[in-house]
Structure formats: structure tokens, C-alpha cells
A protein has these predicted regions:
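Short, glycine-/aromatic-enriched active-site segment of Class I SAM-dependent methyltransferases
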Residues: 10-11, 131-153, 157-165
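A C-terminal cap/extension of S-adenosyl-L-methionine-dependent methyltransferases
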Residues: 15, 181-247
Length: 247
């Protein structure tokens, strides 16, 4: 990702509506769908500045990987332990067969060979372990935001399902989320393309709008995995080995 993306993440990940609401949505989703043991060993790959680590720590003992040095330092402070530098798909130095949960939250789209990355993660799971995946949805929503984040792709459900299957994994279901605000996001992307003002700035909006968007997005914690949401800006799923249960 461009340096400015990490800088904005560090500045805004505790206040921006998207980060705050998404953490709550994913926490509820894991509580309902994860089936994790109480002493779960968890690895977040591509943790950025570590804004998801406290949420994941509610489910077990957390370790983390981040390849950007400055972000890794911030994440280590939040985690209270060193954060590894182990790029996908090689994951050098990462123990195989060791984790109950691996979280890759808006990470897989950054990896050129997504199938190899998913296979590498699967090799690090304990029997019955799971991979929590979120990715950006809809190729037609490609924008300057994807460019500065060094995305290789945005996914459809079909392309994500193919990558999952090719990696020898199975999904508990591909669910759209960030759906209630999808019309606004879609209009913004199309308008930006038509006017030539395709802005990559993801700083928080004015406080009133930031609170409003957070409230609307957070409401999806009651819906994701329970009520079909379509379409959405993102897709979430839990993966497990093809021969095991995805629940």
C-alpha cells in the first residue's frame, strides 16, 4: 500500500466510522459462526496498525503479521508483543498446523496469487481451524482507493468461490456486508468516475456524518449471517479445510 494509506490508518483507525463499525460486525459474526475454543490461538495476517487486534483478543491468544515496518511497530505496541514480518504466500517462520483461527481482513486482494496465499494459510491451521476472510466486492467499483491500496482485484462471489475451491477450502457461505450504505458508495464511485474526481482520501467525514454512518453500518451486526444482504461493498466468509465442517 502507499505510505499515505498506512499514515491515514494510524491517524483514524480508532475514530473512523468504517473501522469502528466493522470491528463490531466481525466480533458478532465470529461469536455466532466461529465455534472457537476458549483458549483459541489466533493469527492476524496483514494486521496494519493493529486496529483489529483488541477485538480478536476477546476470542483467544493473538499473534500478528505485518510487512510494513512503521505499521508493524504501532501494531506491536497495541498487541504488547512483537509482530512478525512474514509475507504471503511464503509465511516464513510461521508455525504450521498451529492456529484455531487466521484472520485476513481486506488482505487477500493485495496478493497476486490469492490461491497460493489461501493454501499457505490453510497449512497453518490446526485440524478444524478456520480462516476469517473479508474482501472488497464488485469489479465495477474499482477506484483510486483500490490503486493506492495496491489491490490486484475486487471480488465477485463467483471469483472468490473459485479461489476458495482451488485452494482446497470450503466456505460457510459468502455474505455481503456494508450493504445499507451501498447505494451511497455506488453513487460516489460512479460520480467520481464520471467527473474525474475519483478521490482516494478515506479520512473521516465531518463528525455528524461519521456518527451517522457508524450507526447505520454497525446495525449490520444484527444482520450479517442471519439475513441475506445484497449487494454490499465487501464480502465476509469463514473457511475451513474441504474435508471438515465449516461450522
Amino acid at each position: 500500500m502507499d505510505r499515505i494509506v498506512y499514515d491515514r490508518m494510524a491517524a483514524h483507525d480508532s475514530t473512523h466510522w468504517w473501522y469502528r463499525a466493522r470491528r463490531d460486525i466481525l466480533a458478532d459474526y465470529l461469536t455466532r459462526e466461529g465455534g472457537l475454543p476458549k483458549d483459541a490461538r489466533i493469527l492476524e495476517i496483514g494486521c496494519g496498525t493493529g486496529h483489529n487486534l483488541p477485538m480478536l483478543a476477546a476470542f483467544g491468544s493473538v499473534e500478528a503479521i505485518e510487512i510494513d515496518p512503521a505499521a508493524r511497530e504501532i501494531a506491536a505496541e497495541r498487541l504488547g508483543r512483537p509482530v512478525s514480518n512474514a509475507p504471503l504466500p511464503a509465511l516464513p517462520g510461521i508455525e504450521r498446523g498451529a492456529y484455531d483461527l487466521i484472520a485476513v481482513l481486506d488482505v487477500v486482494e493485495h496478493i497476486e496469487d490469492d490461491v497460493a496465499a489461501l493454501r499457505a494459510m490453510a497449512a497453518c491451521l490446526k485440524p478444524g481451524g478456520k480462516i476469517l476472510v473479508t474482501v472488497p466486492a464488485h469489479r465495477w467499483m474499482w477506484s483510486a482507493h483500490d490503486v493506492v491500496n495496491h489491490h490486484h482485484r475486487r471480488y465477485s462471489k463467483a471469483t472468490l468461490a473459485t479461489a476458495i475451491s482451488d485452494a482446497g477450502l470450503r466456505s460457510n457461505g459468502l455474505r455481503y456486508f456494508n450493504s445499507l450504505l451501498f447505494p451511497l458508495a455506488a453513487v460516489a464511485r460512479v460520480a467520481g468516475r464520471m467527473t474525474g474526481r475519483d478521490d482516494s482520501d478515506d479520512s473521516p467525514p465531518p463528525p455528524v456524518l461519521n456518527r451517522l454512518f457508524e450507526t447505520i453500518f454497525r446495525f449490520e451486526r444484527h444482520l450479517v449471517g442471519r439475513v441475506p444482504l445484497s449487494p454490499g461493498v465487501s464480502i465476509v466468509t469463514l473457511l475451513s479445510a474441504a474435508g471438515s465442517s465449516a461450522r
